[in-house]
Protein backbone atom coordinates (compact mmCIF):
# COMPACT_ATOMS: atom_id res chain seq x y z
CA UNK A 1 0.00 0.00 0.00
CA UNK A 2 1.21 3.48 -0.78
CA UNK A 3 -1.02 5.02 1.88
CA UNK A 4 -0.45 5.43 5.58
CA UNK A 5 -2.65 3.31 7.79
CA UNK A 6 -3.27 2.50 11.44
CA UNK A 7 -4.03 -0.97 12.77
CA UNK A 8 -6.45 -1.23 15.67
CA UNK A 9 -7.20 -4.60 17.26
CA UNK A 10 -10.54 -4.51 19.07
CA UNK A 11 -11.44 -8.20 19.17
CA UNK A 12 -14.20 -9.42 21.46
CA UNK A 13 -12.92 -7.24 24.27
CA UNK A 14 -9.76 -5.28 24.96
CA UNK A 15 -8.43 -7.59 27.66
CA UNK A 16 -10.36 -10.78 26.88
CA UNK A 17 -9.85 -12.33 23.53
CA UNK A 18 -6.90 -13.77 21.68
CA UNK A 19 -4.33 -11.42 23.18
CA UNK A 20 -1.44 -11.35 22.44
CA UNK A 21 -1.91 -13.74 19.52
CA UNK A 22 -3.95 -11.29 17.41
CA UNK A 23 -1.56 -8.38 17.62
CA UNK A 24 1.52 -10.62 17.37
CA UNK A 25 0.20 -12.19 14.15
CA UNK A 26 -0.53 -8.74 12.72
CA UNK A 27 2.98 -7.61 13.68
CA UNK A 28 4.58 -10.73 12.15
CA UNK A 29 2.67 -10.41 8.86
CA UNK A 30 3.53 -6.72 8.55
CA UNK A 31 7.18 -7.47 9.31
CA UNK A 32 7.23 -10.21 6.63
CA UNK A 33 5.94 -7.59 4.21
CA UNK A 34 8.65 -5.10 5.23
CA UNK A 35 6.26 -2.82 7.11
CA UNK A 36 7.94 -1.62 10.28
CA UNK A 37 5.98 -1.43 13.55
CA UNK A 38 7.70 0.09 16.58
CA UNK A 39 5.36 -0.92 19.38
CA UNK A 40 1.95 -1.81 20.67
CA UNK A 41 -0.31 0.59 22.57
CA UNK A 42 -2.75 -0.85 25.11
CA UNK A 43 -5.57 1.49 26.05
CA UNK A 44 -8.66 -0.31 27.42
CA UNK A 45 -10.27 2.94 28.64
CA UNK A 46 -14.01 3.02 27.86
CA UNK A 47 -15.81 6.23 28.72
CA UNK A 48 -17.81 5.91 31.90
CA UNK A 49 -17.20 2.22 32.63
CA UNK A 50 -13.47 1.45 32.36
CA UNK A 51 -10.43 3.42 33.49
CA UNK A 52 -6.72 2.91 34.08
CA UNK A 53 -4.84 4.70 36.84
CA UNK A 54 -1.31 3.93 38.07
CA UNK A 55 -1.36 1.12 35.49
CA UNK A 56 -4.25 -0.61 37.30
CA UNK A 57 -7.28 -1.15 35.09
CA UNK A 58 -10.70 -0.78 36.73
CA UNK A 59 -14.23 -1.66 35.68
CA UNK A 60 -17.28 0.09 37.10
CA UNK A 61 -19.42 -2.60 38.77
CA UNK A 62 -22.52 -1.50 40.70
CA UNK A 63 -21.12 2.04 41.08
CA UNK A 64 -17.79 0.76 42.48
CA UNK A 65 -14.45 0.84 40.62
CA UNK A 66 -13.19 -2.76 40.80
CA UNK A 67 -9.71 -3.88 39.64
CA UNK A 68 -10.34 -5.85 36.44
CA UNK A 69 -8.53 -8.93 37.73
CA UNK A 70 -11.25 -9.32 40.36
CA UNK A 71 -14.15 -9.13 37.91
CA UNK A 72 -16.09 -11.73 35.95
CA UNK A 73 -14.16 -10.65 32.82
CA UNK A 74 -10.92 -12.01 34.27
CA UNK A 75 -12.58 -15.33 35.05
CA UNK A 76 -13.66 -15.99 31.45
CA UNK A 77 -13.19 -19.74 30.84
CA UNK A 78 -11.43 -19.22 27.52
CA UNK A 79 -9.55 -15.95 28.08
CA UNK A 80 -8.92 -15.80 31.82
CA UNK A 81 -6.27 -13.62 33.45
CA UNK A 82 -5.36 -12.53 36.97
CA UNK A 83 -3.50 -9.24 36.66
CA UNK A 84 -5.22 -5.87 37.08
CA UNK A 85 -1.92 -4.05 36.58
CA UNK A 86 -1.64 -3.77 32.79
CA UNK A 87 2.14 -4.16 32.80
CA UNK A 88 1.74 -7.41 34.71
CA UNK A 89 -1.16 -8.36 32.42
CA UNK A 90 1.20 -8.07 29.43
CA UNK A 91 3.78 -10.25 31.16
CA UNK A 92 1.10 -12.79 32.16
CA UNK A 93 -0.57 -13.02 28.76
CA UNK A 94 2.71 -13.13 26.79
CA UNK A 95 4.14 -15.83 29.08
CA UNK A 96 6.97 -13.43 29.98
CA UNK A 97 7.95 -12.77 26.35
CA UNK A 98 7.39 -9.11 27.29
CA UNK A 99 8.20 -8.38 30.92
CA UNK A 100 6.26 -5.89 33.00
CA UNK A 101 9.50 -3.98 33.51
CA UNK A 102 9.89 -3.51 29.74
CA UNK A 103 6.51 -1.81 29.33
CA UNK A 104 6.37 1.96 29.00
CA UNK A 105 3.71 3.65 31.08
CA UNK A 106 2.04 6.93 30.19
CA UNK A 107 0.69 8.16 33.51
CA UNK A 108 -2.11 10.67 34.04
CA UNK A 109 0.58 13.18 35.04
CA UNK A 110 2.56 12.42 31.85
CA UNK A 111 -0.51 13.18 29.74
CA UNK A 112 -0.47 16.76 31.03
CA UNK A 113 2.90 17.27 29.27
CA UNK A 114 2.47 16.64 25.55
CA UNK A 115 6.18 16.90 24.76
CA UNK A 116 6.97 14.24 27.39
CA UNK A 117 4.39 11.86 25.91
CA UNK A 118 5.74 12.46 22.39
CA UNK A 119 9.27 11.80 23.65
CA UNK A 120 8.25 8.57 25.40
CA UNK A 121 6.36 7.34 22.34
CA UNK A 122 9.25 8.22 20.04
CA UNK A 123 11.60 6.15 22.24
CA UNK A 124 9.69 2.91 21.59
CA UNK A 125 11.18 0.13 19.46
CA UNK A 126 11.19 -3.66 19.31
CA UNK A 127 7.39 -3.95 19.57
CA UNK A 128 7.51 -2.75 23.18
CA UNK A 129 4.20 -2.33 24.93
CA UNK A 130 2.89 1.09 25.94
CA UNK A 131 0.25 1.37 28.67
CA UNK A 132 -2.01 4.44 28.46
CA UNK A 133 -3.54 5.53 31.75
CA UNK A 134 -6.88 7.33 31.30
CA UNK A 135 -9.61 8.27 33.72
CA UNK A 136 -11.66 10.56 31.47
CA UNK A 137 -12.10 11.57 27.83
CA UNK A 138 -9.83 14.60 28.34
CA UNK A 139 -6.96 12.23 29.23
CA UNK A 140 -7.66 10.25 26.08
CA UNK A 141 -7.78 13.40 23.96
CA UNK A 142 -4.42 14.52 25.35
CA UNK A 143 -2.93 11.13 24.51
CA UNK A 144 -4.25 11.24 20.93
CA UNK A 145 -2.97 14.79 20.43
CA UNK A 146 0.53 13.69 21.50
CA UNK A 147 0.39 10.43 19.52
CA UNK A 148 -0.38 12.33 16.33
CA UNK A 149 2.93 14.18 16.71
CA UNK A 150 5.09 11.04 16.92
CA UNK A 151 7.41 9.58 14.32
CA UNK A 152 6.62 5.97 15.19
CA UNK A 153 4.13 3.37 14.01
CA UNK A 154 2.08 1.28 16.41
CA UNK A 155 -0.52 -1.44 16.56
CA UNK A 156 -3.31 -0.51 18.98
CA UNK A 157 -5.14 -2.88 21.33
CA UNK A 158 -7.91 -0.72 22.68
CA UNK A 159 -11.53 -0.12 23.56
CA UNK A 160 -13.99 1.83 21.42
CA UNK A 161 -13.33 5.22 23.02
CA UNK A 162 -9.81 5.38 21.55
CA UNK A 163 -11.08 4.45 18.09
CA UNK A 164 -13.49 7.38 18.28
CA UNK A 165 -10.71 9.79 19.30
CA UNK A 166 -8.18 8.53 16.74
CA UNK A 167 -10.79 8.95 14.01
CA UNK A 168 -11.85 12.38 15.28
CA UNK A 169 -15.42 11.09 15.31
CA UNK A 170 -17.92 13.39 16.97
CA UNK A 171 -21.16 12.32 18.57
CA UNK A 172 -23.92 12.17 15.97
CA UNK A 173 -27.04 10.29 15.00
CA UNK A 174 -26.81 6.97 13.19
CA UNK A 175 -25.26 7.06 9.73
CA UNK A 176 -27.46 7.07 6.69
CA UNK A 177 -26.47 5.37 3.42
CA UNK A 178 -25.61 8.74 1.87
CA UNK A 179 -23.15 9.43 4.70
CA UNK A 180 -21.18 6.27 3.94
CA UNK A 181 -20.56 6.74 0.22
CA UNK A 182 -17.73 9.15 -0.48
CA UNK A 183 -14.81 8.03 -2.63
CA UNK A 184 -12.45 10.77 -1.47
CA UNK A 185 -12.14 10.14 2.26
CA UNK A 186 -10.31 6.81 2.63
CA UNK A 187 -11.96 3.89 4.28
CA UNK A 188 -12.39 1.51 7.14
CA UNK A 189 -11.74 -2.22 6.94
CA UNK A 190 -13.52 -4.46 9.44
CA UNK A 191 -12.56 -8.11 9.88
CA UNK A 192 -14.65 -10.39 12.02
Locate predicted features:
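Acidic, glycine-rich loop-and-beta core segments that form the ion-binding/anion-interacting portion
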Residues: 147-192
Amino acid sequence: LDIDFTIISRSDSTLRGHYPTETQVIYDVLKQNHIHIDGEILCPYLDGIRRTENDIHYVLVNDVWVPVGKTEFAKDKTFSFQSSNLKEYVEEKTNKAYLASSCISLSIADLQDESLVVSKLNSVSGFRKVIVNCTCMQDLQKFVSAYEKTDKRYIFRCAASLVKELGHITDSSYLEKEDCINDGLGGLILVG
